[in-house]
């Protein structure tokens, strides 16, 4: 009986030890440090000098942009709002009064807006950030009880893709007078990044001493800052008073036809 008691005691301790080690192994979860060293500024200052004001109003529609999945919703909203703000500044700098339309659809113009607007500016496009497949590598953590880090890594270069199209409309008819498109893949923007995520397995004992770094969010913000500046620079070049006044005759004819 005594021997049997010792055996049961040993088996119980072994069971507890096994459960403790098992819990330790399952609980191993390496820490990931996400850097936050880049601010999403989205700044642009009109390059041309302010010209003489005109007694003309331009309707500015909200941008109809779509974004890649790796761009956070708050970044999308700021990009859209800053686009409206900076294009408004560019148009004001060219001597126009700007009426902001809280819609991206020209069909939402009120009759009063159609009547008083000399022109309307609409924007649509896709803002895409993607890893360059030629310069990006992925490394997945292998399962293991001891030396598995429990971290998957993707390291490479983030590049832009997509497009932005700006359309100049006559508000009363809704007809397009002109447009221009920017191919974002042609921009010389390259942001190095390291994206670190937890593996599907928990990692081994060594994972408790591992700290992973993830700067992919900073790379996204840096790329968006540069993309925004490039887009605004092109819009600033195109939406000059000289160019916009060249639509005077066509705009007047279209508005006149609808007013008859």
Curated annotation (Swiss-Prot):
What is this entry's stated membrane topology?
Lipid-anchor
UniProt entry keywords in alphabetical sequence: Cell outer membrane, Lipoprotein, Membrane, Palmitate, Signal
Where found in the cell? Cell outer membrane
Q: Which SUPFAM superfamilies match?
A: XCC0632-like (SSF159594)
Kindly give the InterPro entries that the UniProt entry links to this protein: NeuraminylLac-bd_hemagglutn (IPR007876), NeuraminylLac-bd_hemagglutn_sf (IPR038531)
- Ranges for the region named N-acetyl-neuraminyl-alpha(2,3)-lactose binding motif are 134-139
Task: Spell out where lipidation (S-diacylglycerol cysteine) occurs.
Answer: 28
What span is annotated as the signal peptide, if there is one?
1-27
User: Mind telling me what this protein is named?
Assistant: Neuraminyllactose-binding hemagglutinin
Q: What is the lineage of its organism?
A: Bacteria, Pseudomonadati, Campylobacterota, Epsilonproteobacteria, Campylobacterales
Gene name in the database record: hpaA
């Amino acid at each position: 009986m005594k021997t049997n008691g010792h055996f049961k005691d040993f088996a119980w301790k072994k069971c507890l030890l096994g459960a403790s080690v098992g819990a330790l192994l399952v609980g191993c979860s390496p820490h990931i440090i996400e850097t936050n060293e880049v601010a999403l500024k989205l700044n642009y200052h009109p390059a041309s000098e302010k010209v003489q004001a005109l007694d003309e109003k331009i309707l500015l529609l909200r941008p109809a942009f779509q974004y890649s999945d790796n761009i956070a919703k708050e970044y999308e909203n700021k990009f859209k709002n800053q686009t409206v703000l900076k294009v408004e500044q560019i148009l004001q700098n060219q001597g126009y009064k700007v009426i902001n339309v809280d819609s991206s659809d020209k069909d939402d113009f009120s009759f009063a807006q159609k009547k008083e607007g000399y022109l309307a500016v609409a924007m649509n496009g896709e803002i895409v950030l993607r890893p360059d497949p030629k310069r990006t590598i992925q490394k997945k953590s292998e399962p293991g009880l001891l030396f598995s880090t429990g971290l998957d890594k993707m390291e490479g270069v983030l590049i832009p893709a997509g497009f932005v199209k700006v359309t100049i409309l006559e508000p009363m008819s809704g007809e397009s007078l002109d447009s221009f498109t920017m191919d974002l893949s042609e921009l010389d923007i390259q942001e190095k990044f390291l994206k670190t995520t937890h593996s599907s397995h928990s990692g081994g004992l060594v994972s408790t001493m591992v700290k992973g770094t993830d700067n992919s969010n900073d790379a996204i913000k840096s790329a968006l800052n540069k993309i925004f500046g490039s887009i605004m620079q092109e819009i600033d070049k195109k939406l000059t008073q000289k160019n916009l006044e060249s639509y005077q005759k066509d705009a007047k004819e279209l508005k006149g036809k609808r007013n008859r």
